């Protein structure tokens, strides 16, 4: 036997290297085979519900790192709630209708207009489902736990029927109407867009300053006067039917020396405009308030058949332009509102593809709207005063990335204005985890217009509306419920397979159809109505869920998307928000803080992370960032997170190794019988338990990460485990001192494994497989630990807080001695302490081997004053010298009692007593050489 064999060197097969990329799929298959999700649900039956409703990602392509962050966050919450006394099911969902899938099929060569519509929709469905299953596998690879066999998909018959019923209730309440209002129109998609489907980019446009000649000045302006107008959309002049001024803005009538014409502009802008137009010696002839100009009539710049009326509008400002805007009610919301109020014609001169129509005039017909500037300039002639290129923020179609226009077309709308206050009141009852989130959603609802819910596409849920022979729209409770029932059985494709009459209830009649003939609507619903109905299609329809949900968790872009549409439909139907809490997340940026883009080549695919680091590192990264704001991710950042993971893993490996001979049923030492330092570590750990439990409850993942890493680095590695080897390696295997420390080790190991499970389930299960005395076969089936408090807890904490200050001072003294070459390692030191009474009392209260705690070979507490050369602090001073004696081959301390023993061992008296008591046979035979 060798002397080193008398040490209790921790042994474990738990590997230092995690091998996550190869091991994770093996564990995941084991969980699936063991039906862990179902077993967890069974354990939680009868417990209070906590329902996190999954916002459905769009089923197209593999998941990106933003998806991963969002879904890992959801998984952490679901797992922590499931282990905290809640029935927390997770039903994953997917959004499957809409233009992107049509675009994919088009790229694959599918020609929609050349094939049967039902066959086309079948192709859309097949593609969408293939993407659902692809993404499902992506999410499962992240280690997510959920009901993967009973997911929800917006294209299933039961879901589509539930969506129709949401629409039906809104129709019954009078919230659905048809109107020809200007809407965001995407010529690239040939469809109307909702606000949630647009994004803003900078765009360079040609702006024109031109003049309309007064035709009837109403006794205020002469007919040789021109009103100066500014526009950034020259094509809309073809549909201009008025000029709008601000009622309270001052306008001036001016005569430039170089002009025979007189002009009207906003007084505040005269100087800048004169410079722009090259006007010199400008004479101000008169000043008018905007309201005085109301109902003056001007000529259209070139269309002699059209007069343009001066009207008043609150949207006119003097921030730019001329303080006067031309008004084309068919091409803008403000224009429409003031135009309708003043009886202006709603002219639309651009078709669905962005091509100018015949009513724009022969010179414009057939041109693309954005290419007509030269023709407009030619038509304006000397009415054009200036032109310039401007860069401004402009709306784009979020899918095609092409600019859009406002365009008045007949559309179906869901009224928001009719119950806006009810929606705002519902927002006040929701808990937002960021105050700005509440403000953002509140302001969006307060300021938004009615919702355009019709789309001129094929792949989606049909609007369940019929038309009588006289054109009357039919959407009664009876007809809508009948359609819902048909969809429930056959799916929405039945709408296209049958004619209108066979989609209506048997024997249905309507006074507007004396011949019994009907037509059906061919528009489909906005996809935001699809996902916005999920509270009904999922929460209401599934017996193991609750409505409203406890939590909606999505990216911050969903304040104008899913949070918004779900809120409107839910309040419209039931008067309540579909969620009790909203938690939002920022976007994922690259390591430099730049937006991720395939074109920039700075994206990170979750699959690449899984291959290089493992999903566990991605999961740990999610907790290491403040996801309420935009967050950065790169392979370098993940490499740093991987180092943190390695530290966590190796610390827990040390605990596993050094409790391998510990049986909690036999070897646990009661708290009251622990040493003071062990009590301190037990209390500190339970403070960590409370911090983590509270943070899980509040979804504060970063708090968990910081607290955990700090505890491992500061409390364990830098202190408790730093001197632990002197106890667990050196002392007798069954000694009280060793069992005391092992009791703390085991308690921390078991509980920290449970606390880590929601974040690092793969690693937690790997650790759990080494804990043979724990009852549950999987840690995921256990409960999170409860924090304990102990008698005299504050007193113990105060004592050890003071000791940590003392320890820091001692370490400074040792460092000075090391720099002076007095010692090398701290174990070479004999530390003499010159304490005042406070420190002396402290060291007595610590009631531990202080030399061991400071990792020095010898320590003396001296009486009297410290020598002049001592390293002094306010309450204590230290001197450091090299310890006397020889290095013990067993404990490595320098000790005066170290000597060669008769059994061929050079060891100190303390080690000799341990060896002689526990290894009599080796002592009798003598130890082998090293």
UniProtKB/Swiss-Prot annotation:
UniProt cross-references to SUPFAM superfamilies, sorted A to Z: Anticodon-binding domain of a subclass of class I aminoacyl-tRNA synthetases, Nucleotidylyl transferase, ValRS/IleRS/LeuRS editing domain
InterPro entries in UniProt: aa-tRNA-synth_I_CS, aa-tRNA-synth_Ia, Anticodon_Ile_BEm, Ile-tRNA-ligase, Ile-tRNA-ligase_type1, Ile-tRNA_ligase, M/V/L/I-tRNA-synth_anticd-bd, Rossmann-like_a/b/a_fold
Major subcellular location class: cytoplasm
Primary enzyme class: ligase
Motif ('HIGH' region): 57-67
Gene Ontology cellular component list: cytosol
Residue positions binding L-isoleucyl-5'-AMP: 554
Gene Ontology molecular-function annotations: aminoacyl-tRNA deacylase activity; ATP binding; isoleucine-tRNA ligase activity; tRNA binding; zinc ion binding
Cofactor(s) listed in the protein's UniProt record: Zn(2+)
Chain span(s) of sequence motif 'KMSKS' region: 595-599
This enzyme's EC code(s): 6.1.1.5
Protein's cellular compartments: Cytoplasm
Keywords recorded for this protein, A-Z: Aminoacyl-tRNA synthetase, ATP-binding, Cytoplasm, Ligase, Metal-binding, Nucleotide-binding, Protein biosynthesis, Zinc
UniProt similarity note: Belongs to the class-I aminoacyl-tRNA synthetase family. IleS type 1 subfamily.
This protein's domain notes: IleRS has two distinct active sites: one for aminoacylation and one for editing. The misactivated valine is translocated from the active site to the editing site, which sterically excludes the correctly activated isoleucine. The single editing site contains two valyl binding pockets, one specific for each substrate (Val-AMP or Val-tRNA(Ile)).
NCBIfam families reported in the protein's UniProt record: ileS
Protein role: Catalyzes the attachment of isoleucine to tRNA(Ile). As IleRS can inadvertently accommodate and process structurally similar amino acids such as valine, to avoid such errors it has two additional distinct tRNA(Ile)-dependent editing activities. One activity is designated as 'pretransfer' editing and involves the hydrolysis of activated Val-AMP. The other activity is designated 'posttransfer' editing and involves deacylation of mischarged Val-tRNA(Ile).
Protein's UniProt name: Isoleucine--tRNA ligase
Originating species: Streptococcus pneumoniae (strain P1031)
Gene designation: ileS
């Amino acid at each position: 036997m060798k002397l080193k064999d008398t040490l209790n060197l921790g042994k474990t097969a738990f590997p230092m290297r995690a091998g996550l990329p190869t091991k994770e799929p093996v564990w995941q298959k084991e969980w699936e085979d063991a039906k862990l999700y179902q077993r967890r649900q069974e354990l939680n039956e009868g417990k209070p519900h906590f329902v996190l409703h999954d916002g459905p990602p769009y089923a197209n392509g593999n998941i990106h790192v933003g998806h991963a962050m969002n879904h890992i966050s959801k998984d952490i919450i679901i797992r922590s709630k499931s282990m905290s006394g809640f029935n927390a099911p997770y039903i994953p969902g997917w959004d499957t209708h809409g233009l992107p899938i049509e675009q994919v099929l088009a790229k694959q060569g599918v020609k929609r207009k050349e094939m049967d519509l039902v066959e086309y929709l079948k192709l859309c469905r097949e593609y969408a489902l293939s993407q659902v299953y692809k993404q499902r596998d992506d999410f499962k690879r992240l280690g997510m736990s959920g009901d993967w066999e009973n997911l929800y998909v917006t294209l299933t018959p039961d879901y589509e029927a539930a969506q129709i019923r949401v629409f039906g209730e809104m129709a019954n309440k009078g919230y659905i109407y048809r109107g020809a209002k200007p809407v965001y129109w995407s010529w690239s998609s040939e469809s109307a867009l909702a606000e949630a489907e647009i994004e803003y980019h900078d765009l360079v446009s040609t702006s024109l300053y031109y003049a309309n000649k007064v035709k009837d000045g109403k006794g205020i302006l002469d007919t040789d006067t021109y009103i100066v107008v500014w526009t950034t959309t020259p094509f809309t002049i073809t549909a201009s039917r008025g000029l709008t001024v601000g009622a309270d803005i001052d306008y001036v009538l001016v005569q430039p020396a170089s002009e025979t014409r007189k002009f009207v502009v906003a007084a505040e802008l005269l100087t800048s405009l004169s410079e722009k137009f090259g006007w010199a010696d400008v004479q101000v002839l008169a000043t008018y308030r905007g309201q005085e100009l109301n109902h003056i009539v001007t000529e259209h710049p070139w269309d002699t058949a059209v007069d343009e009326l001066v009207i008043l509008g609150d949207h006119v400002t003097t921030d730019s332009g001329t303080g006067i805007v031309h008004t084309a009610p068919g091409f803008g919301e403000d224009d429409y509102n003031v135009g309708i109020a003043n009886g202006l014609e709603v002219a639309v001169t651009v078709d669905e593809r962005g091509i100018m129509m015949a009513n724009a005039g022969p010179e414009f017909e057939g041109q693309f709207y954005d290419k007509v500037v030269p023709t407009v300039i030619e038509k304006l002639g000397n009415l054009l005063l200036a032109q310039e290129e401007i860069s401004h923020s402009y709306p784009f179609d979020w899918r095609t990335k092409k600019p859009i226009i406002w365009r008045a077309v007949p559309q179906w709308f869901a009224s928001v204005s009719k119950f806006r206050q009810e929606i705002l009141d519902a927002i006040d009852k929701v808990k937002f985890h960021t105050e700005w989130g509440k403000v953002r959603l509140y302001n969006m609802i307060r300021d938004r217009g009615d919702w355009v819910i019709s789309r001129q596409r094929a792949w989606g849920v049909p609007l369940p509306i019929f038309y009588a022979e006289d054109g009357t729209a039919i959407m009664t409770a009876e007809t809508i419920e009948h359609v819902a029932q048909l969809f429930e059985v056959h799916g929405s494709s039945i709408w296209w397979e049958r004619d209108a009459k066979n989609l209506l209830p048997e024997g249905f009649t309507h006074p507007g159809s004396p011949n019994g003939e009907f037509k059906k609507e061919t528009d489909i619903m906005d996809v935001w109505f699809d996902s916005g109905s999920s509270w009904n299609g999922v929460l209401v329809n599934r017996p193991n869920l609750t409505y409203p949900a406890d939590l909606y968790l999505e990216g911050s872009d969903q304040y104008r998307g899913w949070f918004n549409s779900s809120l409107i439909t839910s309040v419209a139907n039931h008067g309540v928000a579909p969620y009790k809490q909203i938690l939002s997340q920022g976007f994922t940026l690259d390591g430099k803080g730049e937006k991720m883009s395939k074109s920039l080549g700075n994206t990170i695919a979750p699959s690449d992370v899984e291959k290089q680091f493992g999903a566990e590192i991605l999961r740990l990264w999610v907790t290491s960032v403040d996801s309420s704001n935009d967050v950065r991710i790169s392979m370098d950042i993940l490499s740093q997170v991987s180092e943190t993971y390695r530290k966590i893993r190796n610390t827990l490996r040390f605990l596993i190794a050094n409790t391998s001979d510990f049986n909690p049923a036999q070897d646990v030492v009661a708290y009251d019988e622990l040493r003071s330092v062990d009590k301190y570590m037990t209390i500190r750990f339970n403070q960590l338990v409370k911090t983590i439990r509270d943070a899980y409850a509040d979804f504060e993942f970063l708090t968990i990460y910081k607290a955990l890493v700090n505890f491992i680095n500061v409390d364990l590695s830098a202190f408790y485990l730093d001197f632990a080897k002197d106890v667990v390696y050196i002392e007798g295997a069954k000694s009280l001192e060793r069992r005391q420390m092992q009791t703390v080790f085991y308690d921390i190991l078991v509980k920290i494994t449970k606390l880590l499970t929601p974040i690092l389930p793969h690693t937690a299960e790997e650790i759990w497989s080494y804990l043979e005395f724990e009852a549950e076969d999987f840690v995921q089936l256990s409960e999170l630990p409860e924090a304990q408090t102990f008698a005299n807890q504050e007193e113990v904490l105060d004592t050890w807080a003071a000791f940590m200050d003392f320890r820091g001072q001692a370490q400074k003294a040792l460092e000075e001695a090391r720099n002076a070459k007095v010692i090398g390692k701290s174990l070479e030191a004999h530390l003499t302490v010159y304490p005042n009474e406070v420190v002396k009392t402290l060291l007595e209260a610590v009631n531990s081997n202080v030399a061991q705690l400071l990792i020095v070979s010898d320590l003396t507490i001296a009486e009297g004053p410290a020598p002049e050369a001592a390293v002094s602090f306010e309450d204590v001073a230290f001197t450091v010298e090299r310890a006397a004696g020889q290095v013990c081959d067993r404990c490595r301390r320098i000790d005066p009692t170290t000597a060669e023993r008769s059994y061929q061992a050079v060891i100190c008296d303390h080690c000799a007593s341990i060896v002689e008591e526990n290894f009599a046979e080796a002592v009798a035979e003598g130890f082998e050489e090293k």
